[in-house]
Amino acid sequence: MSFFHAGKIRVMLIGGEGREHAIVWSLSKSPKVDLIICAPGNGGTARGSTKIKNCDPDIKATDLTGLLGVAETHRVDLVVPCSDSSIISGAVDFFETRGFRVFGPSKKVAKIEGSKRWAKAFMERHKIPTASYQSFSSPSEASLFLQSQPTSRHVVKASGLAAGKGVFLCNTKEEAEDAVNKFMVERVFGEAGEEIVIEEFLVGRELSVTIITDGKVWRLFPVGQDAQRIYDGNLGPNTGGMGVCIPSDFFNVEEILEIQQTILEPTIRGLEDESKVTPYSFLSITALTNSRS
């Protein structure tokens, strides 16, 4: 089901966070866009243009049936799931099978974001460089592993979605044990922490590489650096992202080409091979250059 309105299109964005506001702001400037529906949107998305309309503030990004009703009511031409939870729940597949044009990854491909354990195993299968790791579903086994390691510094991650907050950079074994306890005993992130990944602690320059792809052809956006820590000066715990500097001048062409050949291309090929469908419309990868343990 798709409608066109005098050569202009109507877009529905699923989600209500900062990224939705940024996308809405950009779409509202296009003469090709007639109406933007934010489901549910937020205070920022509701301001700045007569093209933008928030829908029911109580609707959830995972309520696909309810969102379908919104899309049909407003006769939208394009659906853009922005919320991680909506993507993981299969919003792209859901709307595509009902005749809508959708920008985003299928549910199969979204596993690379929804499960860090699966993502790490995927990288191993396709020989994509990644930090060494172990995954655990038992806090006692995770603790025994930490105590057996010769190094003190580790990265402890919730395997599931935790709104960008499920990564702890631990400088001591005590900090790592505390992270395990938060995830698996206190369950501060609920089901997201039922399984965890413990990685080696790598140090280097971090960059964010973003592409648009249909699974065969891809285009690279300018490379940036994501500010993930909550406080100024790169301090405090990780968040879903406080901002990003684009373009970044800290990386050279040779480094970008290496990332393209060793990470981007194998990832796209691997996702296509394993999903057996057009795997992605959008892919963002964080890489570490000149890394060391």
Give the ranges of each region predicted by the language model.
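ATP-binding N-terminal substructure of ATP-dependent carboxylate-amine bond-forming enzymes
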Residues: M1-K107
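Conserved N-proximal alpha/beta basic substrate-recognition cap immediately N-terminal to
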Residues: A61-S137, E141-S148, V155, L161-A162
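Internal nucleotide-binding/catalytic subdomain
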Residues: C170-S293
